[in-house]
From Swiss-Prot:
This is DNA mismatch repair protein MutS. PANTHER family: DNA MISMATCH REPAIR PROTEIN MSH1, MITOCHONDRIAL, DNA MISMATCH REPAIR PROTEIN MUTS FAMILY MEMBER. Disulfide bonds: none annotated. Belongs to the DNA mismatch repair MutS family. It comes from the Bacteria. Keywords: ATP-binding, DNA damage, DNA repair, DNA-binding, Nucleotide-binding. CDD domains: ABC_MutS1 (cd03284). It holds the Pfam family MutS_I. Gene3D superfamilies: 1.10.1420.10, 6.10.140.430, DNA repair protein MutS, domain I (3.40.1170.10), MutS, connector domain (3.30.420.110), P-loop containing nucleotide triphosphate hydrolases (3.40.50.300). It comes from Salmonella schwarzengrund (strain CVM19633). The lineage of its organism: Bacteria, Pseudomonadati, Pseudomonadota, Gammaproteobacteria, Enterobacterales. One of its GO terms (molecular function) is mismatched DNA binding.
Length: 855
């Protein structure tokens, strides 16, 4: 049966009618329908869940004359199954029994109590600890895009207005949302196709007036002027849809979402999707996290610190006041790193605990962890108090103290609480007098049963008599089969066993009712007290969120201080003058994976030297040199120290990389097409303050086409755009550019060749490379010797055809070694076809006149 069923459910059983009505409200997502100790799925949901979760697909009787496909999961294991579904981009509606089976006529009342979606999860078990989990919404009109993101586990709400497709693609790459909402008429489907968690939403959810109303209602404001987003209509359309979706799925208030922030292009260094991918900031080219910049830099001790560091890496800021403040803090903290990190480690993930508190889904152990975080604050204050740094003291102030809340949680929650409130035993003894009384009654059962057993043995004289309890039959008096005929007349048989009989007496039954009542009352009161704790904590939510943010920032800065000391990084200097000057720069990732010392190299880019033409052998280190420059700039612009002896860096607005390429088969684009698309983006958007890395432009086409394109691109970047450019190439013709235009210089990475072996020096020198060592590299790669030998022969042939291959031509180009030979003269061609032995003297004379006319 398909879920697009007829709304007339009268042919079905009452229970299936209830299920189908609930399912009709959530047709697009899986419905977990609670039945006793299981969540059941029916019809198409069951078939889908069976495939996604690898669980058995069975059948449950029949309804409306058809067998019902069914699959189920145990309620106690639901979080594990939800995690699997969320990771596959699925959403699930959780339907619970809210009625009492004992008093219900017909099916027990059920209700969808929450909807779990990839972008709105807050449960600890479902989240990646050290990664942001974002819900996003995208909107498009004739002027550009609107984009909003929300991290429900922190309340961080952002919007932006990307002007064009490339910028929008870069934002999607940077934020990598777990779930993306888009309008039903969204035109640029190619931009989002293939992304996980796509959700098509009706147009009215993006309506601007509705969005303003929703946002003002959420923030308790009359307008959005105070947030600086009043005129960001496209961004607000996306934000309104996003907020509506969160309210629909969470079905509770969202007090931790207290503001919205506009992200503006001019505030940060812009990196397109290709640049983020090529620089391997948080993900390597294979999709993993090994050997990335984050893998080297992230030794934070809290999950919230790790997430903040990754946000910094993907959004380097251009405000040098902020950057200098971070640098100062990193320097000031160096003497206290070893004392601070063990204490910070104990703080844990306070940010996400607060989100669960706001959503009222925090579990007892969340409150215990919050208490433990509060207990670290006095020690952190004591250590930071001695640090002579204004930014550090500002952070310390934001951390707060929360002594009253710490005291409350120490009094209210036991040291090691159970997982769930319904398990009981969460509220500490002494916190509430009535609860202690009910517990004493329940806990006193053991003493009472011991006294009853002794009394009844003495009264009856039966030495096999025991008093016990089990969950099915409650309290009982047990007598062995051999003595059961001696049981007193007031003993009422309750259960017969193989070797014993079990009885009940009125006194024991009365006590059982009293104990069970006390346990139920204790649990109900405990749940009430637990809910009251939320009411006592939530008024402090804004201050608590500020504290969590300050603690995360402290963790990041302490981590950067430790990394600077451990990895021998230096503090870069910011200048208003354009350019980058690096002394003994190193690649932060490569130097960590090498088994040999890394060769540090200098770099000098300035208004007088804006472009470096980089030549040298394959594997010589050109790409490493280029990438390390971009990574050093990136680290400088998050406020970090950098891997170099000395760095002076001017304003940078964008970083572009055109490094390597692969076929984009899904979009039907060849390697060369991908390369040219990325190149076009650079030429259209780079400015004189952009850092541009161009590696091997023009490889995917013919020699002359490739050389022409590379020449023209270099010329455009150097003469027109005047960007800070590193231009690596194997076209030696380009080494003539410095002679033809200002601001261009040659550098090369050298190698030494000895016989069939080659040694790469990895050292950057001024001037052009003398040769490319292509055959030596091929031999090193294991190309068969006979192929290398034949290649050398062919190379000699080509060089003999064009002996002046390295000479500069008048038109500014240079003959490639593989270029076609010069066009043969008609006289030479005639002589080649001539057989002198067959000529008569008269014919020979005629040939002389003919050749004369051809010259």
């Amino acid at each position: 049966m398909n879920e697009s069923f007829d709304k007339d459910f009268s042919n079905h059983t009452p229970m299936m009618q209830q299920y189908l009505k609930l399912k009709a409200q959530h047709p697009e997502i899986l419905l977990f329908y609670r039945m006793g100790d299981f969540y059941e799925l029916f019809y198409d949901d069951a078939k889908r869940a069976s495939q996604l979760l690898d669980i058995s697909l069975t059948k449950r009787g029949a309804s409306a004359g058809e067998p019902i496909p069914m699959a189920g999961i145990p309620h106690h294991a639901v979080e594990n199954y939800l995690a699997k579904l969320v990771n596959q981009g699925e959403s699930v509606a959780i339907c619970e029994q809210i009625g009492d089976p004992a008093t219900s006529k017909g099916p027990v009342e059920r209700k969808v109590v929450r909807i779990v979606t990839p972008g709105t999860i807050s449960d600890e078990a479902l989240l990646q600890e050290r990664q942001d989990n974002l819900l996003a919404a995208i909107w498009q009109d004739g002027k550009g895009y609107g984009y909003a993101t929300l991290d429900i586990s922190s309340g961080r709400f952002r919007l932006s207005e990307p002007a064009d497709r490339e910028t929008m693609a870069a934002e999607l790459q940077r934020t990598n949302p777990a779930e993306l909402l888009y309008a039903e008429d969204f035109a640029e489907m190619a931009l989002i196709e293939g992304r996980r968690g796509l959700r098509r939403r009706p147009l009215w959810e993006f309506e601007i007036d509705t969005a303003r109303q929703q946002l003002n209602l959420q923030f308790g404001t009359r307008d959005l002027v105070g947030f600086g987003v009043e005129n960001a209509s496209r961004g607000l359309c996306a934000a309104g849809c996003l907020l509506q979706y969160v309210k629909d799925t969470q079905r509770t208030s969202l007090p931790h979402i207290r503001s919205i922030t506009m992200e503006r292009q001019q505030d940060s260094i812009i990196m397109d999707a290709a640049t983020r991918r090529n620089l391997e900031i948080t993900q390597n080219l294979a999709g993993g996290v090994e050997n990335t910049l984050a893998a080297v830099l992230d030794c934070t001790v809290t999950p919230m610190g790790s997430r903040m560091l990754k946000r910094w890496l993907h959004m380097p800021v251009r405000n040098t006041d902020i950057l200098r403040e971070r640098q100062q803090t990193i320097g000031a903290l160096q003497d206290t790193v070893s004392e601070l990190q063990p204490v910070l480690r104990q703080v844990g993930d306070l940010e996400r605990i607060l989100a669960r508190l706001a959503l009222r889904t925090a579990r007892p152990r969340d409150l215990a962890r919050m208490r433990h975080a509060f207990q670290q604050l006095p020690e952190l204050h004591a250590q930071l108090e001695t640090v002579d740094s204004a930014p550090v003291q500002a952070l310390r102030k934001k951390m707060g103290d929360f002594a009253e809340l710490r005291d409350l949680l120490e009094r209210a929650i036991i040291d090691a609480p159970p997982v769930l409130v319904r398990d009981g035993g969460v509220i500490a003894p002494g916190y509430h007098e009535e609860l202690d009384e009910w517990r004493a009654l329940a806990d006193g059962a053991t003493d009472y049963l011991d006294r009853l057993e002794i009394r009844e043995r003495e009264r009856t004289g039966l030495d096999t008599l025991k008093v016990g309890y089990n969950a099915v039959h409650g309290y009982y008096i047990q007598i062995s089969r051999g003595q059961s005929h001696l049981a007193p007349i007031n003993y009422v048989r309750r259960q017969t066993l193989k070797n014993a009989e079990r009885y009940i007496i009125p006194e024991l039954k009365e006590y059982e009712d009293k104990v069970l009542t006390s346990k139920g009352k204790a649990l109900a009161l405990e749940k009430q007290l637990y809910d009251e704790l939320f009411d006592l904590l939530l008024p402090h939510l804004a201050d608590l969120q500020q504290s969590a943010n300050a603690l995360a920032e402290l963790d990041v800065l302490v981590n950067l201080s430790e990394r600077a000391w451990t990895l021998n990084y230096t503090c870069p200097t910011f200048t208003d003058k354009p350019g980058i000057r690096i002394t003994e720069g190193r690649h932060p990732v490569v130097e960590q994976v090498l088994n040999e010392p890394f060769i540090a190299n200098p770099l000098n880019l300035s208004p007088q030297r804006r472009m470096l033409i980089i030549t040298g052998p394959n594997m010589g280190g050109k790409s490493t040199y280029m990438r390390q420059t971009a990574l050093i700039a990136l680290l400088a612009y998050i406020g970090s120290y950098v891997p170099a002896q000395n760095v002076e860096i001017g304003p940078i607005d964008r970083i572009f990389t055109r490094v390597g390429a692969a076929d984009d088969l899904a979009s039907g684009r060849s390697t060369f097409m991908v390369e040219m698309t990325e190149t076009a983006n650079i030429l259209h958007n780079a400015t004189e303050n952009s850092l541009v890395l161009m590696d091997e432009i023009g490889r995917g086409t013919s020699t002359y086409d490739g050389l022409s394109l590379a020449w023209a691109c270099a010329e455009n970047l150097a003469n027109k755009i005047k960007a800070l450019t590193l231009f690596a190439t194997h076209y030696f013709e380009l080494t003539q550019l410095p002679e033809k235009m200002e601001g261009v210089a040659n550098v090369h990475l050298d190698a030494l060749e000895h016989g069939d072996t080659i040694a790469f020096m990895h050292s950057v020198q001024d001037g052009a490379a003398s040769k490319s060592y292509g055959l030596a590299v091929a031999a090193l790669a294991g190309v068969p010797k006979e192929v290398i030998k034949r290649a050398r022969q062919k190379l000699r042939e080509l060089e003999s055809i064009s002996p002046n291959a390295a000479a500069t031509q008048v038109d500014g180009t240079q003959m490639s070694l593989l270029a076609a030979p010069e066009e043969t003269s008609p006289a030479v061609e005639a002589l080649e076809n001539l057989d002198p032995d067959s000529l008569t003297p008269r014919q020979a004379l005629e040939w002389i006149y003919r050749l004369k006319s051809l010259v």
